[in-house]
């Protein structure tokens, strides 16, 4: 009987810890009856689970009688030990640039962490919202368009040039003023937005193509230009192409910044990111990978 109680209390502790991770110090907590209903347990078992969390030092609650109970202190790392996180799966872009091979995994020491590489921010966000993955890496530019929907939280921002170096308009040498057909991979939210920003209402035809074949399609004459993550200049020269910097709009800079999205109600994952990710160490790791000083973590 006692072992059954312990098992049930453990389930309630996990549910309470997930709830508390979404609260802030100073917040009035739900009543014990409300918490018992959410935990699908008795009032007595819920009270016992709450006291266990208090005894462990994860939280401190101030009880003010009829005015309710208030969360006075909380230790996010301690609460996370009570949350059943078996592994973490992060949806990532395809690693065609070494910036994507940086050290996010290295930050999750002791927690099984896996990447799922997928082309197109739309599909990464869709899988995140459907509960297939725990978090997704996209550009800030794409994130801003997704955050107009409900259900997403911007949990981590890494700053400019952490997603890609920069995007430029790639075209045949000397043809930048004669663009009539521009290539566009409709799976790339960034490319769609930047193409619309750059060309505006100009009479330029959008031609659907895969992102990775963009340069060859320009060389063949299928399209005149494409907005693309800049490659080595000597490669463009060999292909008879040139690159024009994208300026005069802050959205072009937003497209270079990596951010991490979670589901808005996944408080444990948001707190886990805040608790374990050292942004300075992450960016330093990323630069070592880019320079070839360190092997990427997969």
Which residue ranges define each predicted feature?
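A short alpha-helical element within helix-turn-helix/winged-helix DNA-binding domains
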Residues: 27-39, 53
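C-terminal regulatory/effector modules of DNA-binding transcriptional regulators
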Residues: 119-122, 129, 134-298
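Intrinsically disordered, low-complexity regulatory regions of nuclear DNA-binding proteins
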Residues: 83, 106, 111-114, 129-139
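Extreme N-terminal segment that seeds HTH/winged-HTH DNA-binding domains in transcriptional regulators
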Residues: 1-31
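Short coil turns linking two alpha-helices in DNA-binding domains
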Residues: 40-49
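Short, hydrophobic-biased segments on the C-terminal half of alpha helices
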Residues: 50-51, 125
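Short alpha-helix C-terminal cap/hinge motif
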Residues: 97-116, 197-198
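HTH-adjacent hinge/linker in prokaryotic transcriptional regulators
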Residues: 51-101
């Amino acid at each position: 009987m006692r072992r059954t109680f312990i098992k049930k209390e453990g389930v309630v502790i996990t549910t309470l810890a997930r709830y508390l991770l979404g609260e802030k110090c100073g917040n009035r907590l739900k009543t014990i009856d409300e918490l018992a209903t959410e935990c699908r347990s008795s009032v007595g078992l819920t009270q016992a689970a709450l006291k266990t969390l208090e005894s462990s030092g994860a939280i401190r609650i101030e009880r003010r009688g009829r005015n309710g109970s208030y969360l006075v202190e909380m230790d996010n790392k301690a609460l996370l030990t009570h949350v059943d996180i078996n592994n973490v799966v992060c949806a990532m872009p395809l690693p065609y640039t070494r910036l994507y091979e940086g050290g996010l995994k290295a930050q999750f020491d002791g927690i099984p962490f896996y990447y799922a590489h997928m082309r197109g921010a739309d599909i990464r966000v869709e899988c995140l919202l459907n509960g297939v993955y725990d978090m997704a890496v996209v550009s800030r530019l794409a994130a801003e368009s997704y955050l107009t929907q409900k259900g997403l939280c911007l949990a981590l921002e890494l700053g400019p040039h952490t997603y890609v170096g920069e995007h430029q308009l790639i075209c045949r040498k000397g043809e930048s003023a004669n663009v009539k057909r521009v290539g566009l991979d409709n799976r790339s939210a960034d490319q769609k937005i930047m193409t619309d920003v750059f060309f505006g209402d100009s009479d330029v035809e959008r031609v659907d193509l895969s992102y990775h074949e963009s340069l060859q399609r320009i060389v063949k004459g299928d399209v005149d230009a494409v907005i693309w993550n800049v490659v080595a200049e000597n490669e463009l020269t060999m292909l008879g192409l040139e690159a024009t910097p994208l300026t005069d709009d802050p959205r072009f800079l937003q497209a270079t910044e990596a951010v991490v999205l979670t589901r808005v109600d996944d408080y444990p994952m948001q707190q886990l990111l805040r608790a374990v990710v050292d942004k300075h160490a992450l960016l330093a790791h990323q630069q070592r990978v880019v320079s070839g000083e360190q092997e990427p973590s997969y």
